Every structure is written in structure tokens, then in C-alpha cells.
Amino acid sequence: MMRRSFFLFATALVLAACSTPQPQLGSDGKPLPRLYKIRPGDTGQIQFRMLDSVNSLRQAAGVSPVEFDAALNAAAATHSRDMSVQNRPWHFGSDGSSPIDRIQRVGYGGKLVGENISETYETELETLAAWMDRPDTKRVILAPDATKMGFSWLQEDNGKIWWTLVMGS
């Protein structure tokens, strides 16, 4: 009898571990958003998911795909860190630098097509969807003259993410 009780208890414990937790509900009865936490090993996966998504959107719009550029990635990373320090999403660095200044500093030899930025708790794909909903940021993503892309972010301890996408030619 003791063995059977132990077996039933162990089975129940295993089944309980397999279930997904119920989401917390807000006062409106809808699930509360979950924090999107980026782990250090996620960098490549996130960058290539964004590149693939941008290129899918560009293909649907009839424009050529873009490829990653290490210098533009560096410029995007620098600006994401700087926006976090300033606690302000805007296109100028704390030293007054512009997007053009930043791509020149990292040695990018091409031309700046545009820069999209965001301060959010959303995923990269939710951020891309928000950019596609605005004519000015959509224009940067679908710019026919863009051939290169840089994409980076900084996530603060509280979960806030500072995203930067830079397009060049």
C-alpha cells in the first residue's frame, strides 16, 4: 500500500511539473504581459530573426534584401547604450553625435539610409511590427537603396529594451 501511494504521489508530481503555469490576469480579465528577458547567448538568434523578418518584408514590398554589416551593428550597439544612459529615445548621442557621426566613427564607408529606435519592453518582432505601422520608420526598413543593416539593443535590469536599427548603402 505504501509503495502504491508513493507511486501515485510521484506520478502526480511529474504531471504537475509538466503543466504550464496559468497567466496572471489584470483587472480587465486579460493576461498581463510577460517580461521578455534577453539572455547573453540569444544575441545571434535575435539578430538573424530580425534580419530574416526585415528581408521578408522587403521581399513582399519588391525591394532587394539587406545583409548585416559589422560596423552598422557596432553603431547600433553604441547608440542603444547611449540612449539607456540618457534615459531618452532619440537620434542624438549624449555627446551630440548624429547617426551619420556614429557610422563614420565605426568606420562604415557607405551612406546612412536611416535609423529606427525604440524604448520598449516588447520583443524585437513586436518592435518591428510597430515600426512597420508608422510611415517614417517603415520607409527606413523598406528603403530601396538600403543594402546593409545594423541591429542591436541594450536591455536594462528592469527589462526595458533600447532597440536600434541602422540601414546603410
Language model segments and positions:
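C-terminal motif of bacterial Sec signal peptides marking the signal peptidase cleavage site
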Residues: 14-17
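A short alpha-helix/helix-coil micro-patch that ends at or immediately precedes a cysteine
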Residues: 27-85
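Classic N-terminal secretory signal peptides
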Residues: 8-12
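Surface-exposed patches in mature extracellular/periplasmic domains of secreted proteins
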Residues: 60-74, 87-96, 114, 138-154
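A well-ordered secondary-structure block
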Residues: 98-169
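Bacterial signal peptide processing site
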Residues: 19-22
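Short, surface-exposed glycine/acidic/tryptophan-bearing loops
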Residues: 25-29, 73-122
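Bacterial N-terminal signal peptides that target proteins for export
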Residues: 1-7
